[in-house]
């Protein structure tokens, strides 16, 4: 005799769409974090800072080469989660050739976004949109860790 097993799905179609979207976003974050071109130690750095998240233990060190107020090289290293690594990777790719003032501006934007003072990602910071969304609000401290290290550098 055969036994038939019936089950009722606990998910609605809209839930399944959201689950697929969440998996897609998580895969995109993994993809970004896996771009480790600038996960390196810069020996001839001009500026450096470390940040540590006391909640989870993530830590990151950022070393920069800044010449004539312009960022010419960006290296990061640390023991951190995929969200922190993805943020550091995006920043390292997108801030090369930026003035210190622009780096300061993006650090301020990041903090204000997660403190709900910004509703959406400004066009000039669109490269951050995969990380800067409501879904990742619980990972705020992880995402902000590289920004905190950068802010220490540009504030001096």
Region locations from a protein language model:
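Extreme N-terminal basic, low-complexity initiation segments
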Residues: 1-9, 13
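C-terminal binding/interaction regions
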Residues: 15-22, 26, 35-38, 118-156
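Structured beta-strand/loop patches that form or line metal/cofactor-binding pockets in enzymes
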Residues: 35, 39-74, 78
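Active-site- and interface-proximal helix/loop "cap" or "latch" segments in soluble metabolic
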Residues: 76-136
């Amino acid at each position: 005799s055969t036994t038939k097993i019936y089950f009722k799905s606990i998910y609605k179609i809209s839930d399944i769409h959201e689950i697929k979207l969440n998996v897609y976003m998580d895969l995109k974050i993994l993809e970004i974090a896996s771009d480790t071109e600038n996960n390196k130690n810069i020996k001839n750095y001009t500026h450096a800072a470390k940040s540590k998240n006391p909640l989870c233990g993530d830590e990151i060190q950022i070393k920069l080469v800044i010449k004539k107020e312009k960022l010419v090289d960006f290296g990061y290293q640390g023991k951190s989660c995929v969200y922190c690594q993805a943020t550091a990777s995006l920043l390292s790719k997108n801030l090369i050739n930026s003035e210190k003032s622009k780096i300061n501006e993006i650090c301020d934007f990041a903090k204000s976004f997660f403190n709900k003072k910004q509703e959406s990602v400004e066009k000039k910071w669109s490269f951050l949109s995969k990380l800067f969304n409501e879904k990742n609000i619980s990972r705020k401290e992880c995402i902000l860790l590289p920004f905190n290290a950068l802010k220490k550098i540009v504030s001096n």
